[in-house]
Swiss-Prot record:
NCBIfam families: PRK04019.1-2 (NF003096), PRK04019.1-5 (NF003098). It comes from Methanococcus maripaludis (strain C6 / ATCC BAA-1332). It comes from the Archaea. The lineage of its organism: Archaea, Methanobacteriati, Methanobacteriota, Methanomada group, Methanococci. One of its GO terms (cellular component) is cytosolic large ribosomal subunit. Pfam families: Ribosomal_L10 (PF00466), RL10P_insert (PF17777). The gene is rpl10. This is Large ribosomal subunit protein uL10.
């Protein structure tokens, strides 16, 4: 905090700026520090227009932002907030918003735009010039293309590039001449935008590496975790609002299977038990000699006839709900 003794030594505009920054820092629950040092003025204005309704962006000197952060941390008794000042770097600015850190990062990332590479900068990737017409009339630009190693000639009254050409490799320094030519050709190999330095929320500071996630992979992991939890709940018979219906249905089907296998007759399993017994009878009869069989059995064996086996009734769920409320009383009570 600026004390009375030192206040007169500090320029009034600095005091006002720190107070304005403090007010901004206290205005929302999410505070981010961003790097905007390499963002050209035109792109910066475009970005500000895109995010204006979702967040407040304020630029200031790093020293003043540091002081404001530390004073807010002291005034609110929140030492964790003071650590945000450690992320101040380069041409930093403050963003105040109620948007959660991951959505904020995605919004800023999507607001980035392509831009020409500057002379003296490092090539972010291999930069290739494609063959074809430049649309420019004959003139000095032809010599400029050749000067940076791009094969060019006049074609149908326009300057044309003869073949595809990689003019610089990733990591190499771009010369001023090449930067001018690439810009004239409309080649924008650089992506510019607001880069996240740190985002504060509820005592936690997130960095870019933590906020950059693969959404499809993340959703896939959540779906896999849900499926595993669902299966565990069903197999361990731990009812939840999401699994109780499946658990009851599984218990019903298991009980029905036991009833059929043990020939425990109920109104729901009688047809299945009789059908199974009939099929077994036909199978055994098929092993016997013809002398031991009457004509009816012989006919059924020769035609492959078998009694129909009852399929699971469609209205099982209704039965399950009725039985769920009833006390357990042996297999018969489940049907």
């Amino acid at each position: 905090m600026i004390d009375a003794k030192s206040e007169h030594k500090i320029a009034p505009w600095k005091i006002e700026e720190v107070n304005a920054l403090k007010e901004l820092l206290k205005s929302t629950s999410i505070i981010a520090l961003i790097d905007m040092m390499e963002v050209p003025a035109v792109q910066l204005q475009e970005i500000r227009d895109k995010i204006r309704d979702q967040m407040t962006l304020k630029m200031s000197r790093n020293t003043l932002m540091k002081r404001a952060i530390e004073e807010v941390a002291e005034e609110t008794g929140n030492p964790e907030f003071a650590k945000l000042a450690d992320y101040l770097d380069k041409g930093a600015a403050i963003i105040a918003t109620e948007m959660n850190p991951f959505k904020l990062f995605k919004t800023l990332d999507e607001s980035k735009s392509p831009a020409p590479v500057k002379g003296g900068a490092t090539a972010p990737c291999d930069i290739e010039v494609k063959a074809g017409s430049t649309g420019m009339p004959p003139g000095p630009f032809l010599s400029e293309l050749k000067a940076v190693g791009i094969p060019a000639a006049i074609d149908k009254g326009k300057i044309g590039i003869k073949e595809d050409k990689v003019v610089i490799k990733e990591g190499e320094v771009v010369s001023q001449k090449l930067a001018v030519v690439l810009s004239a050709l409309g080649i924008k190999p650089v992506t510019v935008g607001l880069n996240v330095l740190g985002v504060y929320e509820d005592g936690v500071i997130y960095t870019e590496s933590e906020l950059r996630i693969d959404e499809e992979e993340f959703i896939g992991k959540i779906q896999k975790a849900y499926t595993s939890a669902f299966n565990l709940s069903v197999n361990a018979v731990i009812p939840t609002s999401a699994t109780v219906e499946t658990i009851v249905q599984k218990a019903f089907n298991d009980a029905k299977a036991v009833s059929v296998e043990s020939a425990f007759v109920t109104d729901k399993t009688a047809d299945a038990i009789l059908g199974k017994a009939y099929a077994q009878m036909i199978a055994v009869a098929g092993l016997a000699s013809d002398d031991a069989l009457d004509e009816e059995l012989k006919e059924k064996i020769s035609s492959g006839a078998a009694a129909p086996v009852e399929e699971a009734p469609v209205e099982e769920k209704k039965e399950e709900k009725k039985e769920e409320a009833a006390p357990a009383a042996g297999l018969g009570m489940l049907f």
